[in-house]
A protein has these predicted regions:
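NAD(P)+-binding Rossmann beta1-loop-alpha1 motif at the extreme N-terminus of oxidoreductases
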Residues: 1-57, 62
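Phosphate-coordination loops involved in phosphoryl transfer and adenosine-cofactor binding
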Residues: 3-6, 93, 139
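Short, well-ordered alpha-helices that flank and scaffold nucleotide-derived cofactor binding pockets
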Residues: 17, 21-25, 47, 81, ...
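Short, hydrophobic beta-strand segments that form beta-sheet elements in well-ordered domains
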Residues: 33-36, 96-99, 144-145
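Rossmann-like NAD(P)(H) cofactor-binding subdomain of soluble oxidoreductases
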Residues: 39, 49-132
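Internal alpha-helical scaffold of NAD(P)-dependent oxidoreductase catalytic cores
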Residues: 41-48, 113, 117, 132-224, ...
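NAD(P)-dependent Rossmann-like dehydrogenase/reductase catalytic/cofactor-binding core
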Residues: 209-287
């Protein structure tokens, strides 16, 4: 890169704040203008990043080389339309990307119509707290999709801040993102059910975090070292059908939705332990 690219950010949540801070602090981009749902949020992000001017409206944002739209999926299209309206007054097209793992770059079509290069970037990372995220981002896989020229620039920018970039096929994005949901988001739901179950079973509240940590750490370590098929344990994996049936019924009495999850997960656990895959034989042959 010959010079720092100017960067504008629309959406100062955890993802936008983290990426803006990394791009600024690594000397990759010069953060210029920041816009969010409230002016205060944009101002707080500017302070955290150490650069940038908070804008009260998208219309107040100056032209920039790169635009990051780190907004909820439901807002990407409308924000792109608002930016395209403003961009009519800009001297030349720019490059814009959104951070949705689900939506394709074509969601930014109002900008594409103006000659902008567009892409989507999905860092495969749990953005919980910007301070921790900035410190832990190095080595994060980043899925890229969109225009080749935009992908080329983003690969350069993200690699410079520690990202490990790979390409995602446009038509595969929904399934790709669903896999990430299974890997990360649903894990939190399952852990919450486990904690609630221990509490309902009378386990002392002070002991629950220790039980939780012991099981979770061991499971994660085994998964990373051995892979899912060899790491799977429990009554379903062992084929203890009587235990599974009784336990499933009891769980359903306590928590109907959790009972349904227990039954379905038990089927998949048994299949994984015996065949090495959660897919049914018919599904596996079709694939």
């Amino acid at each position: 890169m010959q010079r720092m690219k100017s960067l504008n950010v629309i959406g100062c949540g955890r993802v936008g704040t983290t990426l803006a801070a990394l791009l600024q602090r690594h000397g990759v981009c010069e953060v210029q203008d920041l816009y969010s749902t409230t002016l205060q949020t944009a101002q707080e992000t500017a302070r955290f990043v150490g650069a940038g001017t908070a804008a009260a409206r998208i219309a107040d944002m100056r032209p920039a080389d790169v635009w990051m739209l780190s907004v909820p999926d439901s807002q990407v299209a409308s924000v792109a339309a608002a930016l395209a309206k403003q961009a009519l007054a800009y001297p030349r097209p720019s490059m814009a990307f959104h951070c949705s793992g689900f939506l394709p770059a074509s969601t930014l079509k109002p900008l594409q119509a103006l000659g902008w290069q567009t892409a989507s970037v999905h860092p495969v990372f749990n953005f919980a707290d910007p301070v921790r995220c900035v410190a832990q981002f190095n080595g994060t896989p980043c899925g890229l999709e969109g225009d080749e020229s935009a992908i080329s620039l983003l690969r350069e920018l993200l690699t410079a801040i520690g990202g490990d970039c790979f390409s995602v096929q446009t038509g595969s994005k929904p399934l790709y993102h669903a896999a990430a949901v299974f890997s990360s988001n649903f894990m939190a739901v399952l852990q919450a059910i486990a904690r609630e179950g221990w509490s309902a079973a009378g386990v002392p509240e002070a002991l629950i975090p220790r039980i939780h940590e012991s099981l979770l750490r061991g499971s994660v370590e085994n998964l990373l070292v051995m892979g899912p098929a060899k790491a799977i344990t429990g009554p379903a994996a062992r084929g203890d059908t009587a235990v599974v049936a009784i336990q499933g019924a009891l769980v359903s009495q306590w928590h109907p939705e959790a009972g349904e999850i227990y039954r379905e997960m038990s089927v998949l656990a048994r299949r994984l332990s015996t065949t090495g895959s959660t897919a049914s034989p018919t599904e596996a042959r079709a694939a």
